[in-house]
């Protein structure tokens, strides 16, 4: 009679990486449940997470290294050994570096994000400035908008202490299972919720106020809310006078965005705009929760988000209890994430075209120009791509990018499934799922969790970092951290927290780090903002300096796609809105 054992592990289909109790029988995954020891989950999983068996045992999984045996895009591959695969990669990437220079090779990371620091280390060891990720069309645009104002990493809302929560393009029930649990508990507590979303979602249904705007008009709505807040004297004068740069110009600009005018632009009734502004500014502390991509997936996307983020500053809700806060809970230092810097001694993709991207420390190449650097005569040409989870379907002009992938001298994709993008590759390598590998997780509140390997890797699939280590060893690339082995790498990540890998493994429910950094608020009182002015910049000096050369504007100026594009709106009245999460679907390594 087979015995069922429960393995503490994680689901890494999407960013939150929910903790999972995996039920294993005879070495096979038999079922999954959300971990019950975590307050945010309480045993819950989304539809994708609950379908783990369909995901892990999908018949379309790539299980062996596969070398192209036909024309690019034809989809004909032959099975080879890992030694042959490593030899093929080393031979081609070393040849291309010798012939064209290291910058002619791109190192690309899709999802999940756990292996990104290791891939960046590989790019650095190779000598290429062209480490890039799917965030070129996703999160980094939102992060850039934030940094242009505050100069630091994005600060989410201090959820346990908010009195008003404004959800801007954030459908928690479909995109963040742990956070949706906290959201439900806050609703029971009686907080006010304003939801900004073109769609009537489950989250919007629960809100006190739903601002159902026309897609792409977020900037006009935010500027109109600012107009009301300033006009009705609801802004935080003390904070603005002491810590904000460019308020006068900002104030003058927003005066034109009355709720009456904004109603015509956004479709949101003027009275609802006024009510939302008064609620957010007057019933605080208030926090804004935003998502990575829907707002920025439009013309003027970065400026639209800058208009949204500016509301936090003018109401004094920055880095205060219940507002958008840098460190609302204890935290613990770790190595790797955000610590590995990109090799920048040569020009990267997009550096001439998007200088603010690099000035604002995105610390990766701007991959939106990848197809151009392959197909056209740019400053230099990209000849090779080493990718982990590249899917052309998420990029603008996807067919052009797929065509470009077919023109490369050499292209590797590490994947779970044989996507169209993988069919263009010279070599496809099999990655394993989170159920087939070990991993350490640094979580909110300074908590750490060891994700156990529930089952052995299917076929000859490997974890992504072990693949990176294998390639680097074969190529003779040097990195003192990675080449010590995977266990040593996990140990290295944990070292600043004051815990060992062995300790963490002995705490199946997770454990607190030892070198805790306490919560903080109003850090700006002792430390200046990391902006050129040392203040919150409603008028960005970084963007302003590129006004003449690139047309960037320091204020969060609103440009309407309906009046500034040549598309016939009568013939094409519909507006594409992207970036939402479908609760029951995933695609390759995207969710």
Identify the residue ranges that each predicted region occupies.
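N-terminal export/assembly segments and adjacent metallocofactor-ligating motifs
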Residues: 1-232, 261, 269, 473
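A cross-kingdom feature strongest in bacterial/archaeal respiratory oxidoreductases
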Residues: 2, 6-10, 162-167, 171-206, ...
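Hydrophobic alpha-helical scaffolding
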Residues: 52, 75-79, 149-155, 169-173, ...
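N-terminal leader/propeptide and maturation segments of large enzyme subunits in energy/redox metabolism
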Residues: 64, 68-84, 98, 227, ...
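Flexible glycine/proline-enriched surface loops and loop-helix/loop-strand junctions
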Residues: 71, 206-207, 256-260, 289-295, ...
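Conserved short loop/turn motifs at secondary-structure junctions
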Residues: 105-113, 264-268, 291-298, 331-332, ...
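A glycine-rich phosphate-binding loop feature that marks nucleotide/adenosyl-phosphate handling sites
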Residues: 110-111, 242-245, 280, 324-335, ...
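A glycine-rich, hydrophobic/aromatic-adjacent loop/helix-cap motif
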Residues: 280-378, 445, 518, 527, ...
